[in-house]
Amino acid sequence: MMRTFLSRARDTGRDQGSVPTAAATSRTGRTRPAACALALAAALAAPAAARAQDPAPDSLRAAELDSLRERLRRAEDAIELLREQLAAQAASGVQTRTRVRADLFGRVLTNAFYNDAAVNNADVPLFVATPTTPSGEERPQGGLGASVRQTSVGVAVSVSHVLGGDFLGDLQADFFGGQQPSTGGRNFPLLRVRKARGIVRWARGELLAGQESPLVADVDPVSVASVGTPGFTAAGNLWLWAPQLRGTLQLGTRARLAVQGAVAAPTTGDPAAPFDTDVDAAEQSKRPVLQLRLRSRWGEDDTRGEIGVGAHRGWVRSADGSLVTSEALVVSAEVPLTRVVELRGEVYTGQALRGLGGGGIGQNLTAAGEPVRDRGGWAQLDVRPRSYFQFGAGCGVADPEDEDVPAGRLRNVVCAAHAIARPGGGVLVGLEFRRLRTTYAAGPEENDHLNLAAGFEF
């Protein structure tokens, strides 16, 4: 047995590839007998020690087996649940022809509304109308109704490694495109494109092509009562979505400054014919809209803020064939005061701004063909004490020069308060009260608007 043990010890040393030095060999020669003796004693003592130990009780082994079985069962259940979730996710995804994953999103929204005076639009009023029409007929003084035409739907895609950056694209549509003359009227609304964007983002810039909000006025108030037309339109909010090519270059400073520029399609904002459309007065200028903006951002996620200063310039052809300049200077901001309180808003000054969405209370040129000078703005405070509940209030005003519109709308002030709850499962409920006050040469007209919204998001 001793020979066998020593032989195995020598084989182990060779397998480990040890190459002892002369000094090490000398020391090993003197210590090898003692080491072998100790190893032999340990080998002989091990069986005795093992026999001296009492075997584990059968009950303890059974408990250990039951515990292992329970943990194995829970692991199998978790794996099965994960498989079901992955299968459901794969089934819910939309596979496009280009094999790019597309995500559907949207909001089904029912709005019940009440007005106590004549307004320009029943479910989303922008200003108060005069009690009588220009021909002298009495207007209906308020009413009660409901609609689902602020329902919206969209699709989004994202692809990595496109032109050295990341590509994001989306299409957003709603049913606020008006209605065909029919028995159903507002209950059978027309589909309308809101935004359609393709964006390539790099580390220090991005390029956008498609239909988007004006570069200089890219902030809207929070509301589930005024979605088809953003809140405070014709009362300080410039919003009209338009086709454009937009670029952003980050300057890499501590203030996270960025320079933005856009070339947009010209428009006066005038109503178009139902089917065949012609060029409007802005398109007749044969010049695009030019916009430039300098912005600064700070914070992340719930505490991210932004402030920007932008300039807008466009052209409109007047009745005598001359070109009238549309221009504006706009300051917009989203400022998180705390993690649950945010202040947002815009202020502007300019002229001939109907093409940006409600500027000049929808009045572009004077009777003499001169631009309507205008100034306005809005601000809203929004509080979100819980992830499922938020409330807030704000006001907006548009104030054209009285001498430019002596027979038109001289001033429009809108104040609104809202509360929105999302109890879970995508369900949402919102309540908004809005007071509108529009001033004419004959005096102010007022309307109280109450809107109850209910629906779900997906």
Placement of each model-derived feature along the sequence:
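Outer membrane beta-barrel
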Residues: 93-130, 134-269, 286-301, 306, ...
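Bacterial N-terminal signal peptides
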Residues: 35-45
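N-terminal periplasmic/intermembrane-space "pro-region" immediately following the signal or transit peptide
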Residues: 51-123, 136
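Outer-membrane beta-barrel "beta-signal"
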Residues: 421, 446-458
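Detector for outer-membrane/organellar transmembrane beta-barrel domains
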Residues: 285, 292, 297-409, 413
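Sequence/structural signature of outer-membrane beta-barrel proteins
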Residues: 115, 176-182, 212-218, 229-231, ...
